[in-house]
A protein has these predicted regions:
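Charged catalytic and DNA/RNA-contacting regions of genome-maintenance
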Residues: 1-180
Length: 180
């Protein structure tokens, strides 16, 4: 979530999809993440967070991920149930969204009114590029210095606004499998 822009993306992966979670974290490079105790069993994910991500990681109580509390908070914030937001049949995504909203209400003084909708990101709609492929292709940062200059994004980005820049980066980070 980005409370400054109002963007909130939600996704759900299979329980054994540690590699996909790591790739998603690497794609977004969040400055802060929240998680529950269940993630501590996911050694690949925790190792990536500790060694590569360099962000604030906040361990939250499992109570914050309670399904009913999540549903109530989602309904209160968006004025509609999670099913109306496209989260029917996605219980893990609903619980994560509820925990995120609870965390944002607790820590953010303002800006939450900008979050008026969510976008469910279906992992099957975009090409799966792991961290190694993304690094070797130099999509958004060079292998040697980690700079933007010299990357595909640097070559293509002729956008005029910050929102356009974010959209261009999103297109490169998650190319569609079927653009039609």
């Amino acid at each position: 979530a980005d409370s400054s822009t109002g963007q909130l993306f939600v996704s759900q992966f299979a329980a054994d999809a540690q590699g996909e979670v790591v790739n998603e974290l690497g794609r977004y490079c969040p400055s802060e993440i929240i998680f529950n105790e269940g993630i501590l069993d996911q050694t690949e994910v925790t190792a990536f967070i500790q060694k590569k991500l360099h962000c604030v990681a906040d361990l939250c109580d499992n109570d914050r991920f309670d399904p009913q509390a999540a549903e109530d908070l989602i309904a209160r914030h968006f004025s509609k149930p999670s099913g109306a937001l496209g989260l029917d049949g996605r219980p893990l995504a609903s619980r994560a969204l509820g925990a995120l909203l609870a965390y944002l209400y607790e820590t953010q003084q303002k800006g939450l009114e900008r979050i008026t909708d969510i976008a469910y990101v279906n992992p099957e709609q975009s090409m799966a590029l792991d961290l190694t492929a993304r690094r070797n292709l130099e999509l958004t940062q060079t292998m040697r210095t980690g700079e933007k200059r010299g990357t595909l994004l640097w070559v293509l980005d002729r956008t005029k606004t910050a929102m356009g820049k974010r959209l261009m980066r999103a297109w490169l980070d998650k190319p569609l499998v079927n653009p039609a």
